[in-house]
Amino acid sequence: MANGSGLSVTELAGSVGFILAVLVEVGAVLGNGTLLVVVLRTPDLQDAFYLAHLCVVDLLAAASIMPLGLLAAPPGLGTVPLDPSSCRAARFLSAALLPACTLGVAALGLARYRLIVHPLRPGARPAPALVLTAVWSAAALLGALSLLGPPPAPPPAPARCSVLAGGLGPFRPLWAMLAFALPALLLLAAYGSIFLVARRAALRPPRGTRPRSDSLDSRLSFLPPLRPRLLGGKAALAPALAVGQFAACWLPYGCACLAPAARAAAAEATVTWVAYSAFAAHPFLYGLLQRPVRLALGRLTRRALPRAPKACTSQAWHLQTLLRRLQELRKDPVLGPSEAPEQARELARQTPSVSEAT
């Protein structure tokens, strides 16, 4: 009985995990696809190049390593076994796309730091193509480390096709430091500097003071507020969310890379899908929370929705309008001498009826 109950609990946990993983997959595809369309249709966004790159990386991950995590046999969530060549391909994709995502997030944070802190120094900002070329070069090198790891086990044994379960061999600590520790430090430095600049601007006193009247409202405005206002609170929201999301999604995966392979393999499915949830969180964190992106999305949505036909409003003809029209007809040279009096008489007959209606 206990064995059956334990089996049912395990099956229930597996089913719930599979449903949550499917929701993460669907959210990553829909969110990044929508944000990519908005960015491509609105090229005047300041960080459009980095946003589009992040969406492309997330969509690549949602089309490659996330379905493998859903369908592949344990340590994945499915039951489809992978042959050695597919196992090596899965290792390479995981080892390359995860650093491309984390380094892309760090590049986006640094770009926003330069736009906010140094807005009038465009020469201090490197070209986005150069930055993203460096990101993909580093991701390709980190992906190549997976090819230097131990070969996959033969088919009778369970194939370990991930970075956590021995896929990198002795290179796992180096991969974790470059894929997670370095982007985390860059992101923390960028958003920390943004927060300090915003807080310093909030603490700065106003340049000029306006003359106040001697009214009661003016005197009451000198009173301190009942609740102390936290200076820089709104400016701290975006950095806190960005750093918090990065730490919540990627810190468990990075710590598992530094743990022994046996302990990392035990928590591989949970830690992997917590990291994959970042692909679904990026469109909301770096898209919908940004006011220019929200405005562009609303504008495109209004254009896409069908517009209701405008109702035809009946125009009421008043007496002054009829008289003005009568004068225009008298002055119109196109009308002949016989046509103008006839139309004048017809308009004159309509005038009493309109005046009675008014």
Curated annotation (Swiss-Prot):
Gene3D superfamilies: Rhodopsin 7-helix transmembrane proteins. Residues 1-17, 75-89, 150-176, 256-268 are extracellular. The keyword Transmembrane applies. The chain crosses the membrane at residues 18-38, 54-74, 90-110, 129-149, 177-197, 235-255, 269-289. It is a multi-pass membrane protein. Expressed in the brain and testes. Expressed widely, in the brain, including the cerebral cortex, cerebellum, hippocampus,thalamus and pituitary gland. In the testes, expressed specifically in the germ cells. It is found in: Cell membrane; Endosome membrane. It comes from the Eukaryota. Residues 334-358 are annotated as: Disordered. Changing A111D: No effect on constitutive activity; No effect on protein level; Does not affect homooligomerization. Residues 39-53, 111-128, 198-234, 290-358 are cytoplasmic. One of its GO terms (biological process) is adenylate cyclase-activating G protein-coupled receptor signaling pathway. Orphan G-protein coupled receptor. Constitutively activates the G(q/11)/inositol phosphate and the G(s)-alpha/cAMP signaling pathways. Has spontaneous activity for beta-arrestin recruitment. Shows a reciprocal regulatory interaction with the melatonin receptor MTNR1B most likely through receptor heteromerization. Belongs to the G-protein coupled receptor 1 family. This is G-protein coupled receptor 62. It comes from Mus musculus.
